[in-house]
């Protein structure tokens, strides 16, 4: 604010931790697993009325019904050099997850923020909405974002056993 960083900002706090590790000769890397729901335009329900399995995790049919949107998101990540490696239907009806390669923690954090904007924008283009809310539907599993964090010394992952 007023040209100064906000100390309590999550991005500033992450940069400070990265700097602390760097002074000790370490590098922080991370990857995230972003979960989201594809919902109808008014936000009242999931968008795919045929996604009704009682245990829908990894449902390929539901994933393929959203192929054009998932492909477009994935193609955008490829074009930006993110190296996506997994797209799947998650544990709840209407829920999906997309993953890309881990990298420097600040880059991953910035990509995560942009990913949400990109998914929401592309979903709208396809006549849908996307939500990353933790629990948009009381009767379905909620969204999460698993973060995998590692500390490196050169090419050595210090967290390996």
Task: Identify the role of each PLM range.
Residues 1-161:
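Glycine-rich, acidic/polar active-site loops that bind/position phosphate-bearing ligands
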């Amino acid at each position: 604010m007023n040209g100064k960083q906000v100390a309590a900002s999550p991005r500033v706090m992450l940069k400070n931790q990265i700097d602390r590790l760097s002074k000790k000769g370490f590098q922080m890397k991370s990857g995230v697993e972003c979960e989201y729901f594809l919902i109808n335009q008014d936000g009242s329900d999931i968008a795919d009325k045929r996604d009704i399995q009682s245990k829908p995790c990894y449902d390929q049919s539901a994933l393929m019904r959203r192929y054009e949107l998932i492909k477009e998101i994935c193609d955008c990540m490829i074009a930006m050099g993110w190296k996506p490696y997994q797209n799947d239907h998650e544990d709840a009806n209407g829920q999906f997850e997309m993953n890309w390669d881990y990298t420097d923690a600040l880059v991953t954090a910035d990509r995560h923020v942009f990913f949400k904007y990109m998914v929401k924008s592309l979903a709208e283009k396809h006549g849908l909405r996307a939500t990353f809310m933790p629990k948009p539907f009381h009767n379905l599993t909620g969204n999460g974002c698993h973060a995998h964090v590692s500390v490196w010394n050169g090419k050595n992952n210090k967290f390996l056993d």
